[in-house]
Amino acid sequence: MKRREILKATILGSGAAALGSIATEKSQAQQTLATNLNPQKSIDVLIVGAGNAGIPAAIEAADMGGNVMLIDKNDFVGGMLIISGGHISGANAKIQMRKEIEDSYEKHYQDAMRIGKFKANSELLALATEHAARMIDWLEEIGVEFTDESPVLVDDHDHYSVPRTYIGKNLARSLLWPLQQELDKRISRGNLDIRLETKALNLLQDKNKKVIGVRVKNKSGDISDLLAKTVILTTGGYGANKSMQQQYNPKVVSAKWVGLPHATGDGIIMAKEIGAKLANMNHLISYPGTVFDLKGFPTAISTRLQFPPKHYTQSVWVNKKAERFVNEHTTPDNRETAFLKQEELFFYVVFDKNVSEQLGTLDIRNWTREQMDQEINSGNIIISAGSLKQLAAKLGISSQGLVDTIREYNERIEKGKRDQYGRTKQRRIINKPPFFAFGVGGSVLNTHGGISVNSSLEVIDEDGMVISGLYAAGEVLGNGHLMGEGVVSGMSVGPAITFGRLVARTAYRNAQCQCSDETV
């Protein structure tokens, strides 16, 4: 089967063995379903979501000899791998060892715990770090090409103690292309079926509350039941679902979702309907640094800020109260913490003609000097004015407040006093007109809350009891399990692949020893 067929076509599944009767209703069922259907007549492993965790899970389950089905509501596979940076991390992978970098999965675990403020799930973090090297080695074996510099320390987040983050030469697509090829092989072999444009609606349960399948709807609106001995949810996060953000994370609703529109929390919603426990739902990190076109705000994104150590700004950052709120050169964790306290998750970068003329590298990533001059003239992204009061008026913030903030900043430089936020580098007086500013907001690429699982990746309920037949992996778990309250380099994409492979083995083994006393 050609890759484009996977990407764009709806591929028929295993037929009547996996297909229940077609329902006449066209609307989504809202209640938890209970049925007497016999899962012994169904597929072994049904995987819902053909993305970062779902593809590896399908490959692994098929390799174990299972009768496997993979479904996705999109008309393509790959999920967030299509757009993400694809950073993965692990200790003692072969690439790292060839470079003679001393590391261990214990150190990886300890670093991740530290960066996550010791709020990560210890069992799941240990599982992820212990198996990370094998995951990276496997990716290399199937043809993933990492940059020559990998593993590296990533500056966008707090650093590990040693370089252990791997980046594909074409970012996440370097991972996706080989994974697609491996998926093709299993489909051609005959024990893996895939259905695209197939949206999961509800989880099916028998009288004993064991999950035995999924109710789905195809693009024509037809509803059917797919029966399975085990079900794995790999549906991703909920960043594109504003109502869920409003319910669980109202403070970050104003942040711009920069992922794909399919991340609507479907798996989380379905699991919660049948009693699954959710975790970390009140925690969602909005990353500072998204530069907006102010005339098109909040929908028009321009690019991103550059941060230390690649770039130390000569500008100052002020919030909507016209006040500085952080050392502009601080650590990623301190920067994110300070940013999350700001009104509407927004601030302005303010500078003057002196700074604009002296900039060695620009605050805005990938901009040239010529582009900066063009944007100053257009006034879409960079706003200019002859005085600080006029600039504040254009920005809609306190004129006197901005004047006072810049005056205090300048006076401390002139008098040789310590910066009130501890900034030590690139302290230049801002006093030469014209004055400039551009707006910076927050963005959300993934979500921290999701389904709770045990160390076997079985979904658990509010009492900690296993919901039989149901498993989960990837962002549907939420990154908070592994990142705690921080952002840990390579601990979203990497563990999704790792957990996808691990959960497939567990689900398949359990499918093989399963018997049901229920009859149709």
Regions from the language model: what does each represent?
Residues 268-270, 274-394:
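An anion/pyrophosphate-binding glycine-rich loop and adjacent beta-alpha core
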